[in-house]
Each structure stands twice: as structure tokens, then as C-alpha cells.
Amino acid sequence: MRFFHPTEYYKFEIPDTWLMAARANNFIPQEQAFTPVFDPEWPSTLIDALQITQTHTGPGMPQFDEARMVSVLRDMVKGTPLPAIWCSRDTPDGKLVLRHGRHRFHAAVALKFKKIPVSIRPHFEI
């Protein structure tokens, strides 16, 4: 199934077979966001999915690992707590940039969660 990220203007696909394997093909979220794991060192906050941008890597992105995506989708559908995605706020416009949690981010967008648990952390280029 094709999905569209409304503020980044790109399409991404999660195959129907993956959605069915995760029992996510008819999922309707009852909560604003997937359930985050509590981390006292790096607390998370719920952020509107439209406020998150990502670093674009390579032509034809995004590419997902099937086992990882099915696992993430399944956990979101079951309500299993997952780590918040990591973002930094280091763009001139102050937008949040996705740094870690690409599968969780795209799964949440595909499942139509309005908010995403985000842990805002500094980003360092190595």
C-alpha cells in the first residue's frame, strides 16, 4: 500500500503482505500515538507527525527491512511499548529532524497516528 507524507511531499510503500502479516491492514488507531517506552534519561513528548522532517538518503528512499517493519507494525497494533523516535532540532527553521527510528516513524504515519513520541536529542556529525 502506498502512503504519502504530507509535509515532505514523498510517497513510500509498505507492501500489503507486510501489513497483513502484522495484522495492520484494517487498523484504526484508538490513541493519538503509539505507546512509548518510558526513559527517564531521555523523556519523550508527543509531536504532530507533520512537524518532523527526515534526512533524505539516496534515490528511491525510504527502504525498509521487512522483518523490522512487520515487527514494528505488529507492536503498534498490539499496543506494545516501543522506544520514542530520536529527533534533533538543528535546522535553520527549527524543524525536528528524524535521526533514529525510521521504521517506527513511517509505520506510525502509515497507521495514521496523529502524534509520534519523540525524544529530542543533540545531533553530532562524526
Model-predicted regions and their roles:
Residues 2-13, 17-18, 81-126:
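A short, basic-hydrophobic beta/loop patch
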Residues 37-99, 109:
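Short alpha-helix boundary/capping and kink motifs at helix termini
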Residues 1-66:
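An acidic, glycine-rich, mixed-charge low-complexity segment common to nucleic-acid enzymes
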